[in-house]
Amino acid sequence: MAPSAPAKTAKALDAKKKVVKGKRTTHRRQVRTSVHFRRPVTLKTARQARFPRKSAPKTSKMDHFRIIQHPLTTESAMKKIEEHNTLVFIVSNDANKYQIKDAVHKLYNVQALKVNTLITPLQQKKAYVRLTADYDALDVANKIGVI
């Protein structure tokens, strides 16, 4: 079945317009000044894994309860509590000062001003946690059960 008369005329008019307008773009030949062709950098999308390599993500073994092992209750520790507003803890050897400060905040709801650490001759890490002026180390020690 042949196309209808109005469709034919529409197609002819469209062709006429294209002829009158002429070719829009002219292909310009690129001048190459080098004998070496450097391949252009193209988009490289990130690879997507088809399945996870581990069935469950690894949980952190350094939780707050592992970082702070126990408070120290020696006479020198009591003196620090009374005179310097400082709590003394035995902590994990793997913990750093930031982790200790965060663990004290999470476990005892107190803000630490600074943390000093040392390794004892018994290869234990001891942390001196100085509290801010807002908190009293004696009250916190009572709450913990040190005194």
UniProtKB/Swiss-Prot annotation:
The keyword Transport does not apply. Keywords: Ribonucleoprotein, Ribosomal protein, RNA-binding, rRNA-binding. Pfam families: Ribosomal_L23, Ribosomal_L23eN. Residues 18-29 have a biased composition (Basic residues). Residues 1-29 are annotated as: Disordered. Residues 1-10 have a biased composition (Low complexity). This is Large ribosomal subunit protein uL23A. It comes from Caenorhabditis elegans.
